């Protein structure tokens, strides 16, 4: 009887509100403080990320602070949207479980720029998940975003941020259990590359943020070295990526009068039809790469490479623009 009464009293005991408990223990703050922290980090990114990105890639971007939002970490992560790549991140002596997200549109547009497309030719990409190579590029982008954050929060020890491999929004975070019940902040930034406008987000538990003083980073003396490292990593990705090739075969010279009278079914011979092989020029991104010969193997037409027009390094530079 006594045990039953004690159990009933325990069941009826009031439970403390989770938000109130978080406030009392330093895990949740007011809107004004959140707005100040968000604006400070937003200013850090808008001031330093474009210069850092340009010095390491040679590509210009614009970054602008959008706003911040407070809430449970699980809710904030669910609200980043579907057209993003997400990564679990940590920074020793600062925060073991924050997350970053970058819009897929920015990554796709950046990949096109790396492969030689001009800024004016790149429009808003279709909404889709990123491929494996695009996720690799997203990791590099998030690494630069994390680098600016690291320099601003000034965590003791000067450690670099750890970024797990990014995943598409339908993936699963390794932090799900760790962040359950934690309150956090989403800091949203607009990021433009050419005509493509996208976003990236920083989702951080409030507890480490409330202990952080944002400071402007010092100019890096390693910019050139980082640029070389960046280009080397992109080069490796390009070597493993698929690039659309174009083959051009010269046709027999015709008069303007003849060309104007061509109709469906007319045949135009190759210019080199009388030679042993038919010459083909293979190019990518408007740059001539190989001299080839045209032929047939079984039921398939194909070209055979005869010689390089450029060196391997020149070919790679053509493909990267």
UniProtKB/Swiss-Prot annotation:
Disulfide bonds: none annotated. It is a peripheral membrane protein. One of its GO terms (cellular component) is plasma membrane. The keyword Signal does not apply. The keyword Cell membrane applies. GO terms for biological process: bacterial-type flagellum-dependent swarming motility; chemotaxis; positive chemotaxis. InterPro entries: CheC-like_sf, FliN-like_C, SpoA-like_sf. It holds the Pfam family FliMN_C. It is found in: Cell inner membrane; Bacterial flagellum basal body. Keywords: Bacterial flagellum, Cell inner membrane, Cell membrane, Chemotaxis, Flagellar rotation, Membrane. Its main location: membrane. Belongs to the FliM family. FliM is one of three proteins (FliG, FliN, FliM) that forms the rotor-mounted switch complex (C ring), located at the base of the basal body. This complex interacts with the CheY and CheZ chemotaxis proteins, in addition to contacting components of the motor that determine the direction of flagellar rotation. This is Flagellar motor switch protein FliM. It comes from Agrobacterium fabrum (strain C58 / ATCC 33970) (Agrobacterium tumefaciens (strain C58)). The gene is fliM.
């Amino acid at each position: 009887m006594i045990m039953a009464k004690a159990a009933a009293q325990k069941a009826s005991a009031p439970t403390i509100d989770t938000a109130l408990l978080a406030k009392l223990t330093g895990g949740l703050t007011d809107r004004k403080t959140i707005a100040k922290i968000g604006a400070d980090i937003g200013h850090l990114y808008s001031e330093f990320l474009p210069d850092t990105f340009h010095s390491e890639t040679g590509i210009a971007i614009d970054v602008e602070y959008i706003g911040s939002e407070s809430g449970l970490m699980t809710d904030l992560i669910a609200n980043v949207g579907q057209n993003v790549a997400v990564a679990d991140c940590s920074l020793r002596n600062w925060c073991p479980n924050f997350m970053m997200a970058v819009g897929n549109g920015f990554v796709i547009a950046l990949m096109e720029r790396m492969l030689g497309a001009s800024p004016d030719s790149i429009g808003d990409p279709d909404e889709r998940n990123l491929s494996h190579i695009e996720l690799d590029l997203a990791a590099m982008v998030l690494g630069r975003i994390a680098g600016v954050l690291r320099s601003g929060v000034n965590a003791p020890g000067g450690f670099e941020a750890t970024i797990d491999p990014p995943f598409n929004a339908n993936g699963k975070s390794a932090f799900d259990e760790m962040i359950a019940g934690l309150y956090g902040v989403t800091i949203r930034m607009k990021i433009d590359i050419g005509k493509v406008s996208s976003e990236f987000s920083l989702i951080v538990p409030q507890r480490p943020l409330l202990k952080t003083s944002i400071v402007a980073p010092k100019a890096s003396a390693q910019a050139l070295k980082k640029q070389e490292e960046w280009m080397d990593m992109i080069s490796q990705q390009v070597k493993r990526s698929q690039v659309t090739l174009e083959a051009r075969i010269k046709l027999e010279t015709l008069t303007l009068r003849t060309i104007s009278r061509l109709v469906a079914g007319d045949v135009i011979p190759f210019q080199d039809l009388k030679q042993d092989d038919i010459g083909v020029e293979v190019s990518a991104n408007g740059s001539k790469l190989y001299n080839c010969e045209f032929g047939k193997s079984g039921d398939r037409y194909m070209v055979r490479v005869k010689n390089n027009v450029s060196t391997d390094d020149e070919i790679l530079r053509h493909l990267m623009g």
